[in-house]
């Protein structure tokens, strides 16, 4: 269930080709056209952005990873005046649009690919992979607390909650207690050190397709980068900046994120009941209508060609003329976890 999505890279001689997941389905749902302005909130290796630019639309591409932005400069030159790269969190995509196009500017589409780029997974020094030895980092950018900070400084109960909720790890408590005992003697600093310790503790069933550390590494990455909070705020920001008729397309790679997107579109289409924050007596006009039926997955051919696409799901909505609804983060049911910015000071 690891969230290993995004652009898939393959070496072809000296050149690297990037194969984005569900690209045909994304373009079909997004419907970019010449002269349209599309926000790619998760630029990564630029796979979606390139295909959108090839339709004649202009792109504002956002990524919090400065390495991705720097790698995209060549594409910026290839499409002069039509691609604007912005180093930013995608939760602030409305601010990025205002910076590039002016306050109050609306756009024709937003696409979000909620997964880790294979470029990040494949770079051992980024610390995302339990299959390659590297520093226990996992940050999308160089700012903020690292996975090592979380593993070595969080309370055992907090670690267990993170592993359980963000990784759906059934051995969460046992792993958290093992970490507490081990770090007292020697802090965890390397990816393989943590991965091997987890494998030694819980064992490895030959029938299991995934490594025993998969869910813990996923949980730490999601926690360190506040990925669920980022997604929630990005969905609300997209609602604010889309024109009537504009399209929001979101690709997710595991169930936590997909449930959030599904809940958002259901709520914005008027499919949810009232809550204590928004009573049923309050008339709410829908801000989105469905652009696709349910969730769209990869074809068998794409799964065969790109195994990382197997867990991908696409959901999409079309912005109505009604005003954005309330920015209510409680809609997403996010857990209360320790703030990552407190770790470096603890």
From Swiss-Prot:
Main location: cytoplasm
Origin superkingdom: Bacteria
Coiled coil (residue ranges): none
InterPro entries assigned to the protein according to its UniProt record, in alphabetical order: RsmH, SAM-dep_MeTrfase_MraW_recog, SAM-dependent_MTases_sf
Keyword rRNA processing set for record: yes
Signal sequence interval, chain numbering: none
Pfam annotation, one family: Methyltransf_5
GO BP annotation list: rRNA base methylation
Cellular component annotations (GO), alphabetically ordered: cytoplasm
Molecular function in Gene Ontology: rRNA (cytosine-N4-)-methyltransferase activity
Function field: Specifically methylates the N4 position of cytidine in position 1402 (C1402) of 16S rRNA.
Protein name from the UniProt record: Ribosomal RNA small subunit methyltransferase H
